[in-house]
C-alpha cells in the first residue's frame, strides 16, 4: 500500500506514475473522499471545542444555582451530531482504505516505461543454447518415458496437475535439495518450514487480497464464538512469499537484526483463472507446483542493492545447472501489483525455441510493509517501515522442464546435470522406463 500522504501532497504526479503501468487512478473519487474527510474532521474539532466550552458553562451555572437545562440540551445535541459525524468519518476512512488497497506500487525511476512484455529490457545472457544433431522433443514427450505421468494426475484430480514417478521424482527432489543447500550454505538464508494455508490478513499483507482473490484457492472454515458460528476464509498459498513475508507482520525488528533472509520449499497453488488456453500441454502452467522462495527484509536504504543480490542468488542455481538463461528487467506495464522493480530470469526451452520465465525477483519497497505494519527500530529512534523483497530460487517444475529439454539425448535418455549427481546417488543418466 502506498503512503496516502503522497496523494495528499501531489495526486497528479502519483497518477502520472501509475499511468505508466496501465493503472488509471480515479483522482476525482479520491479528492471527493478527501474533501469530505477534511470537512468532517474540521466540523468535529469545532463541535468538540464548543461542547467543552459549554460543559464549563454548565459547571459555572450550577455553581451559581442557576438553570443549566438549555445549555445541557445544546450539549446533548452536539453529542448526537458528533456521533453521526464519527460514523460517517469511519465510512470515509474505510472507503479510502479500500481505495488505497486497490492501487499498485509506484515504479522505480530506473524501470523502463512500456506497455507490456514486448517492451521488457534484456540485461544479460548467460550460456549458449545447445545445438542438437537430432530432432528436439518437448518435455512431455521426453518425460512421459521417464516417469512423468499426466494421465493418472488427471484421473486423480483433473487438468493442470502432474505426477512424477521413480527417477523423475528423485530428480525433482534433488533440485529442491540443491536449491536449499545453495541458498542456506552459500547465500546466508535461514531455511523455514511454513504453513501451506494462511489467513486473509496474511494475504492482504503481501497484496494478494483483495485484488487477486479469484486466482486463489479458498478454504472456508466454520469458526465458533460466543455470538455463534461464522465462516472464516483461509487460502492455499500461491507462493511461500506469503507466509515468509508475514513473519514480520505487526512486528518491530531491531535494526541490528537486519537484513533477514528466509528460504522455504513449498507447493504453490494457483487457480490460473485468467490463463484459459495458455500452456495447456505439460508442466509449464500448473494448479500445483513446487517452488523454492527467497525473501529478504532490509532497511529502506539497502533494498535496491538487495534486489541485485537476490537476483544473483537465483541466477546462481541456473549457472550451477549449466542452463542457458537471460535476465530481463520488466517494464512498467508488465510489473506485478506490489513491485517497484522486478527482474525476471528466463531459461532456454529448446522445443519452444525461446526463453521462458523461471524466476521473478522483486523489490516491493515499503508497499507490503505498510500493509503489514512491519517496522524496524534503530537504537532509541522511532520505528520505520522496512523494505521487503522476494524471488523464486527457483520454480522447481519449470527447472525440471528445462533439464528434460536441454539435457535430452537421441536415445530418449536424459543426462543428469553434474551439480545434481551427488543428490542422485551418483546417477548420471535417466533411462526410459521399460
UniProtKB/Swiss-Prot annotation:
Nucleotide-binding listed as a keyword: yes
Any one GO molecular function term: ATP binding
UniProt keyword annotation of 4Fe-4S present: no
Cellular component annotations (GO), alphabetically ordered: cytoplasm
Pfam families per UniProt: Seryl_tRNA_N, tRNA-synt_2b
Example GO BP: seryl-tRNA aminoacylation
Pathway terms, separated by semicolons: Aminoacyl-tRNA biosynthesis; selenocysteinyl-tRNA(Sec) biosynthesis; L-seryl-tRNA(Sec) from L-serine and tRNA(Sec): step 1/1
Binding site for ATP: 270-272, 357-360
Location of the protein in the cell: Cytoplasm
Catalysis: reaction(s): tRNA(Ser) + L-serine + ATP = L-seryl-tRNA(Ser) + AMP + diphosphate + H(+); tRNA(Sec) + L-serine + ATP = L-seryl-tRNA(Sec) + AMP + diphosphate + H(+)
CDD domains registered for this protein in UniProt: SerRS_core
Primary location group: cytoplasm
Keywords, ordered alphabetically: Aminoacyl-tRNA synthetase, ATP-binding, Cytoplasm, Ligase, Nucleotide-binding, Protein biosynthesis
Binding site for L-serine: 239-241, 293, 392
Assigned EC number: 6.1.1.11
Recorded family membership: Belongs to the class-II aminoacyl-tRNA synthetase family. Type-1 seryl-tRNA synthetase subfamily.
Comment field on protein domains: Consists of two distinct domains, a catalytic core and a N-terminal extension that is involved in tRNA binding.
Alphabetical list of HAMAP family matching this protein: Ser_tRNA_synth_type1 (MF_00176)
Function: Catalyzes the attachment of serine to tRNA(Ser). Is also able to aminoacylate tRNA(Sec) with serine, to form the misacylated tRNA L-seryl-tRNA(Sec), which will be further converted into selenocysteinyl-tRNA(Sec).
Assembly notes: Homodimer. The tRNA molecule binds across the dimer.
UniProt-recorded name of the protein: Serine--tRNA ligase
Provenance organism: Cupriavidus taiwanensis (strain DSM 17343 / BCRC 17206 / CCUG 44338 / CIP 107171 / LMG 19424 / R1)
Lineage: Bacteria, Pseudomonadati, Pseudomonadota, Betaproteobacteria, Burkholderiales
Gene label: serS
Amino acid at each position: 500500500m502506498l503512503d496516502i500522504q503522497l496523494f495528499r501532497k501531489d495526486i497528479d504526479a502519483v497518477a502520472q506514475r501509475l499511468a505508466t503501468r496501465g493503472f488509471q487512478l480515479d483522482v476525482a473519487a479520491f479528492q471527493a473522499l478527501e474533501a469530505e474527510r477534511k470537512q468532517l474532521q474540521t466540523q468535529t474539532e469545532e463541535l468538540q471545542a464548543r461542547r467543552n466550552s459549554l460543559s464549563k458553562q454548565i459547571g459555572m451555572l450550577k455553581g451559581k444555582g442557576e438553570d443549566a437545562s438549555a445549555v445541557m440540551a445544546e450539549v446533548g445535541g452536539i453529542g448526537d451530531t458528533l456521533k453521526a459525524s464519527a460514523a460517517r468519518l469511519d465510512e470515509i476512512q474505510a472507503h479510502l482504505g479500500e481505495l488505497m488497497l486497490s492501487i499498485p506500487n509506484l515504479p522505480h525511476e530506473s524501470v523502463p516505461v512500456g506497455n507490456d512484455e514486448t517492451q521488457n529490457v534484456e540485461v544479460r545472457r548467460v550460456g549458449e543454447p545447445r545445438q542438437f544433431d537430432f530432432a528436439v522433443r518437448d518435455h512431455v514427450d521426453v518425460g512421459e518415458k521417464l516417469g512423468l505421468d499426466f494421465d493418472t494426475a488427471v484421473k486423480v484430480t483433473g487438468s493442470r496437475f502432474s505426477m512424477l514417478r521413480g527417477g523423475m521424482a528423485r530428480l525433482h527432489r534433488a533440485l529442491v535439495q540443491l536449491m536449499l543447500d545453495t541458498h542456506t550454505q552459500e547465500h546466508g538464508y535461514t531455511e523455514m518450514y511454513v504453513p501451506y494455508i494462511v489467513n486473509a490478513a496474511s494475504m492482504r499483507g503481501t497484496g494478494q487480497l483483495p485484488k487477486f482473490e479469484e486466482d486463489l484457492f479458498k478454504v472456508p472454515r466454520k469458526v465458533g464464538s460466543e455470538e455463534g458460528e461464522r465462516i472464516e476464509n483461509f487460502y492455499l498459498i500461491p507462493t511461500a512469499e506469503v507466509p515468509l513475508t508475514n513473519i514480520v507482520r505487526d512486528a518491530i525488528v531491531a535494526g541490528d537484526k537486519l537484513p533477514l533472509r528466509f528460504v522455504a520449499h513449498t507447493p504453490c497453488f494457483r487457480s490460473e483463472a485468467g490463463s484459459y488456453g495458455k500452456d495447456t500441454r505439460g508442466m509449464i502452467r500448473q494448479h500445483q507446483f513446487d517452488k523454492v522462495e527467497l525473501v529478504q527484509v532490509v532497511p529502506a536504504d539497502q533494498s535496491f542493492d538487495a534486489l541485485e543480490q537476490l537476483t544473483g542468488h537465483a541466477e546462481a542455481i541456473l549457472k550451477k545447472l549449466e542452463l542457458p538463461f537471460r535476465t530481463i528487467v520488466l517494464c512498467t506495464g508488465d510489473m506485478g501489483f506490489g513491485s517497484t522493480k522486478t527482474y525476471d530470469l528466463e531459461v532456454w526451452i529448446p522445443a519452444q525455441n525461446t526463453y521462458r520465465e523461471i524466476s521473478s525477483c522483486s523489490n516491493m519497497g515499503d508497499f507490503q510493509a505498510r500493509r503489514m505494519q512491519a517496522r524496524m527500530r534503530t537504537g532509541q529512534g522511532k520505528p520505520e517501515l522496512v523494505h521487503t523483497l522476494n524471488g523464486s530460487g527457483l520454480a522447481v517444475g519449470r527447472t525440471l522442464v528445462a533439464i528434460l529439454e536441454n539435457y535430452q539425448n537421441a536415445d530418449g535418455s536424459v543426462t543428469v546435470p553434474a551439480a545434481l549427481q551427488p543428490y542422485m546417488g551418483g546417477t548420471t543418466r535417466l533411462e526410459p522406463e521399460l
